[in-house]
């Protein structure tokens, strides 16, 4: 789905003159900061639509020809910098006409309201007047009023671009079945912290490792049918956590995508004992994780456990948890472990995954890390 920034023209993209009509080339002035802000939003996946009231356009007091030349030059300037507008919607009525197509009315928006490919949750309206904020409210999207001497306002273009393009990646998932009731809250950019309650203390401890070593904020509350066994609680927690990660990532623009062990790190093992991926030791144990947020879930596990359970967590459910996590998050994960102590082996698996996640989740600009155009 595509987010759209709906943008007023006069006073928002271009400076508004005292007579409120840009009907001559010499009146054309771009608003400060608009081009770098729109480039940042474009790179974050936003499309742009101009929505403007032009009082009496086409009348003797505002001839169409006087409007067309400066408007075409404005669009050409933006286009020369890589900024293209998906549409230009113009209402030509007078305020006294009270037309439904005139902002803050949304009569010009019928086609967009019927478009199911628009990400309305991330879309926004930017303008310089209170009527632009009312327009945003009527569309049920966020509104930003640019700071101007004429109409006030609290925002500049740099702040708007930062707020929309660098928005925190958060998600809340509630999974309720006849077997479990699970709530996951995740903030991929929050301070590393964890509040975990699953009814399984060792499993809690492992999930805390993900939050700590991935560098994310994670809250999980799971109530399951532990009187039967642990399977449903562990499996459904993996599914809910995976769904939360997927939702928080959004369209995945700017992420590292891959989690692996950079070869220059001093703790990477070489030679016959080397394992591909993010490799870490825990005493006699060594675990490796390599992952890809490709959107194609796949899980490969290499390792064995001797004990039936570690604490209150059955060891057969360790790979099952990771498989559930992959299925719901759209992640491809290869995980391997070898050692002597099953406690160390389980914990090293969770820590290796977490460190690979840290790398894959980091943002580096706003470019989508795929040649296909979607992940």
UniProtKB/Swiss-Prot annotation:
The lineage of its organism: Bacteria, Pseudomonadati, Pseudomonadota, Gammaproteobacteria, Lysobacterales. GO terms for biological process: L-histidine biosynthetic process. Keywords: Amino-acid biosynthesis, Cytoplasm, Histidine biosynthesis, Hydrolase, Lyase, Magnesium, Metal-binding, Multifunctional enzyme. Mg(2+) binds at residues 8, 10, 128. The keyword Repressor does not apply. Gene3D superfamilies: HAD superfamily/HAD-like, Imidazole glycerol phosphate dehydratase, domain 1. PROSITE patterns: IGP_DEHYDRATASE_1 (PS00954), IGP_DEHYDRATASE_2 (PS00955). CDD domains: HAD_HisB-N, IGPD. It is found in: Cytoplasm. GO terms for molecular function: histidinol-phosphatase activity; imidazoleglycerol-phosphate dehydratase activity; metal ion binding. Pathway: Amino-acid biosynthesis; L-histidine biosynthesis; L-histidine from 5-phospho-alpha-D-ribose 1-diphosphate: step 6/9; Amino-acid biosynthesis; L-histidine biosynthesis; L-histidine from 5-phospho-alpha-D-ribose 1-diphosphate: step 8/9. Its EC number is 3.1.3.15, 4.2.1.19. The active site is at 8 (nucleophile), 10 (proton donor). This is Histidine biosynthesis bifunctional protein HisB. One of its GO terms (cellular component) is cytoplasm. Residues 1-168 are annotated as: Histidinol-phosphatase. It holds the Pfam family Hydrolase_like. Its cofactor is Mg(2+). It catalyses: D-erythro-1-(imidazol-4-yl)glycerol 3-phosphate = 3-(imidazol-4-yl)-2-oxopropyl phosphate + H2O; L-histidinol phosphate + H2O = L-histidinol + phosphate. Coiled coil: none annotated. SUPFAM superfamilies: HAD-like, Ribosomal protein S5 domain 2-like. In the N-terminal section; belongs to the histidinol-phosphatase family.
């Amino acid at each position: 789905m595509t987010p759209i920034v709906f943008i007023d023209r006069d006073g928002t993209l271009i400076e508004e003159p005292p007579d409120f009509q840009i009907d001559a080339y010499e009146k054309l002035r771009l608003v400060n900061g608009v081009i770098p802000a729109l480039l940042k939003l474009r790179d974050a996946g936003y499309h742009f639509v101009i929505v403007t009231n032009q009082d009496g356009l086409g009348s003797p007091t505002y001839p169409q020809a006087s409007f067309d030349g400066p408007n075409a030059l404005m669009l050409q300037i933006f286009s020369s910098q890589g900024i293209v507008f998906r549409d230009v919607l113009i209402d030509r009525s007078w305020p006294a006409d009270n037309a439904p197509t005139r902002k803050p009315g949304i009569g010009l928006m019928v086609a967009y309201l019927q478009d199911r490919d628009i990400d309305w949750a991330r879309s926004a309206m930017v303008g310089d007047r209170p009527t632009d904020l009312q327009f945003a409210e009527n569309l049920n999207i966020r509104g930003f009023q640019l700071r101007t001497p004429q109409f006030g306002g609290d925002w500049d273009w740099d702040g708007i671009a930062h707020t929309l393009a660098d928005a925190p990646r958060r998600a809340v998932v509630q999974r309720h079945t006849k077997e479990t009731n699970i709530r996951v809250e995740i903030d991929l950019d929050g301070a590393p912290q964890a509040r975990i309650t699953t009814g399984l203390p060792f499993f809690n401890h492992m999930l805390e490792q993900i939050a700590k070593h991935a560098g994310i904020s994670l809250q999980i509350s799971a109530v399951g049918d532990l009187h039967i066994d642990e399977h449903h609680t562990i499996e459904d927690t993996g599914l809910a956590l995976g769904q939360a990660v997927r939702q928080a990532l959004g369209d995945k623009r700017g992420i590292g995508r891959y989690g692996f062990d950079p070869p220059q790190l001093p703790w990477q093992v070489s030679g016959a004992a080397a394992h591909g991926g993010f490799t870490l030791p825990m005493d006699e144990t060594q675990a490796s994780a390599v992952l890809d947020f490709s959107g194609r879930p796949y899980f490969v596990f290499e390792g064995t456990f001797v004990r039936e359970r570690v604490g209150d967590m059955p060891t057969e459910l360790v790979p099952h948890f990771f498989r559930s996590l992959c299925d719901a998050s759209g992640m491809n994960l290869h995980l391997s472990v070898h050692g002597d102590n099953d406690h160390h082996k389980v914990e090293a698996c969770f820590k290796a995954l977490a460190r690979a996640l840290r790398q894959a989740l980091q943002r580096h600009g706003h470019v989508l890390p795929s040649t296909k155009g979607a992940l």
